[in-house]
C-alpha cells in the first residue's frame, strides 16, 4: 500500500523527537490499524491519549503525501481540533458543503449537501472528531460523500455529549473491533 511505504517506525520516532511524547503500545496499535483499514474507530475517555494518537496518525499520512481533511460536528469542536492538531478542521456541514439557500428559493426542497455520491469528497483520509455528537442523518450524508479507498477515521468518547438528533455512532461497538484506547 502506497500509504505504508515509509513505515510506521519513522512516525513513532518523529513523534518522540518533535513532541517529546512517547507513544504507548495501544497508541502504536491504533496508528497501525488506522493505516491498515478503510474505516477506523478510535474511542476513549478524557486523558487516554486520543489527541496524541490522532496527531501521530496525521503525521503518518502527511509523510505519505496523503490529502487529509479534518472535521467535527460543531464549530467549537472544529476549532479545538485545529488548535490541538495544527491542521485546519471544519464542521462536517462545511466539509459536505451545505447548500443553505433561503427557504423561499428552495422550491419545496430542503437544504442539501453539495458533496454526495455524485460529487464526493476529494481526500485520502478524513478524520472526524466528537463522533458522539453526530446523528445518524449527518453520518449517512457523510458516508454517501466518501469514495471507496478513502480512509475514514472516527474519533470520540461514548461517555460525552450525545447527538442532538436520532441515534449516534456510539451504538457502533468499537470495543469489538479492537479500535479502543
Name each region found by the language model.
Residues 60, 64-66, 72-80, 84, ...:
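Conserved helicase motor core of SF1/SF2 NTP-dependent helicases
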Residues 49:
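Conserved glycine(s) of the Walker
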Residues 53:
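Hydrophobic positions on the alpha1 helix immediately C-terminal to the Walker A/P-loop
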Residues 106-120:
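Conserved alpha-helical scaffold flanking the Walker A/P-loop in AAA+ ATPase domains
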Residues 5-6, 10-45:
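Pre-Walker A segment
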Residues 90:
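Short beta-to-alpha loop/turn elements within the nucleotide-binding domains of ABC transporters
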Amino acid at each position: 500500500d502506497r500509504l505504508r511505504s515509509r513505515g510506521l517506525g519513522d512516525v513513532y520516532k518523529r513523534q518522540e523527537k518533535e513532541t517529546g511524547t512517547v507513544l504507548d503500545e495501544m497508541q502504536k496499535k491504533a496508528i497501525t490499524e488506522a493505516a491498515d483499514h478503510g474505516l477506523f474507530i478510535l474511542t476513549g475517555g478524557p486523558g487516554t491519549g486520543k489527541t496524541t494518537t490522532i496527531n501521530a496518525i496525521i503525521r503518518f499520512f502527511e509523510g505519505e503525501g496523503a490529502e487529509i481533511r479534518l472535521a467535527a460536528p460543531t464549530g467549537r469542536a472544529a476549532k479545538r481540533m485545529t488548535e490541538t492538531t495544527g491542521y485546519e478542521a471544519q464542521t462536517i456541514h462545511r466539509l459536505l458543503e451545505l447548500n443553505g439557500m433561503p427557504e423561499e428559493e428552495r422550491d419545496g426542497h430542503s437544504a442539501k449537501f453539495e458533496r454526495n455520491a455524485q460529487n464526493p469528497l476529494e481526500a485520502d483520509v478524513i478524520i472526524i472528531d466528537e463522533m458522539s455528537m453526530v446523528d445518524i442523518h449527518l453520518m449517512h450524508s457523510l458516508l454517501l460523500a466518501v469514495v471507496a479507498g478513502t480512509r475514514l477515521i472516527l474519533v470520540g468518547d461514548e461517555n460525552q455529549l450525545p447527538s442532538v438528533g436520532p441515534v449516534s455512532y456510539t451504538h457502533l461497538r468499537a470495543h469489538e473491533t479492537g479500535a479502543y484506547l
